[in-house]
């Protein structure tokens, strides 16, 4: 439900997969296009928004993806002056209409795992997992941040299959120089949260110039194979 566009693009650029400009598709608050967290908020009930969603989901299905991360969904929960569907008057109604359309597209053909990020806790029925906090990296303070969120939000596993602690970075781009201890803490953080999604470059022939693929492999073989942590998970 986001458009990461500049203001001038709203009036001249067409939403992909539709015949509508960005200005036509976004909600208005006090008569002006509304933004949240730097992105314009799409009207979940607008046909242009729905056509855009249909196009994106079906493209990903054709490419063979089975996992789909849906970020900044909270932009679809912003109260507008009005909606394209005049029977809808609240942000929750609009969100439900837009996400119901999204799920109808996801349900066509092979199933997909839907991971929600920066998403309202409720309504909860549209995702398999939900990010328990915001972006979380590999330093010890980040693990503390994520575990604090788990301590306060553990009960959401009654609604979602998985509480997502974010991707678990061991080395990443190697800019932060995480220690093995920080790596162990972060992987344990993922295990107790209930979802482990590793995110490093493990290539045997890495030519990206980013991170340290050899170190990532060494750390992964040592830390991700920790029997005690894996049994707990």
Positions of predicted regions on the chain:
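Short intrinsically disordered, low-complexity coil segments enriched in acidic
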Residues: 1-6, 42
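Structural preference for beta-strand elements that scaffold enzyme active sites
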Residues: 2, 67-69, 111-115
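Active-site beta-loop-alpha junctions enriched in small/polar residues
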Residues: 4-10, 73-75, 117-121
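Glycan-recognition surfaces
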Residues: 13-51, 55, 96-211
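Active-site groove signature of glycoside hydrolases
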Residues: 53-82
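Intrinsically disordered or highly flexible coil/loop and linker segments, enriched in small
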Residues: 62, 66, 160, 198, ...
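Active-site cleft segment of glycoside hydrolase catalytic domains centered on the general acid/base Glu
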Residues: 78-93
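Non-catalytic C-terminal accessory modules of carbohydrate-active enzymes
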Residues: 204-233
């Amino acid at each position: 439900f986001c458009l990461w566009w500049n203001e001038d693009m709203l009036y001249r650029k067409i939403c992909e997969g539709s015949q509508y400009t960005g200005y036509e598709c976004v909600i208005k608050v006090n008569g002006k296009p509304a933004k949240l967290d730097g992105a314009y908020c799409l009207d979940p009930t607008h046909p242009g928004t729905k056509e855009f969603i249909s196009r994106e989901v079906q493209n990903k299905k054709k490419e063979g993806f089975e996992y789909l991360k849906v970020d900044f969904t909270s932009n679809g929960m912003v109260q507008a002056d009005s909606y394209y569907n005049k029977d809808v008057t609240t942000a929750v109604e609009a969100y439900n209409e837009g996400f119901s359309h999204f799920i109808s597209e996801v349900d066509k053909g092979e199933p997909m795992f839907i991971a929600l990020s920066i998403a309202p806790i409720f309504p909860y029925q549209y995702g398999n997992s939900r990010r328990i906090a915001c972006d979380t990296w590999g330093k010890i303070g980040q693990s503390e941040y994520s575990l604090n969120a788990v301590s306060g939000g553990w009960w959401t596993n009654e609604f979602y299959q998985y509480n997502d602690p974010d991707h678990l970075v061991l080395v990443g781009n190697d800019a932060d120089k995480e220690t093995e201890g920080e790596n162990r803490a972060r992987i344990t953080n993922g295990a107790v949260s209930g979802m482990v999604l590793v995110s490093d470059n493990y290539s045997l022939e890495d030519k990206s110039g980013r991170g340290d693929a050899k170190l990532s492999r060494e750390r992964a073989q040592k830390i991700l194979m920790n029997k005690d942590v894996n049994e707990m998970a």
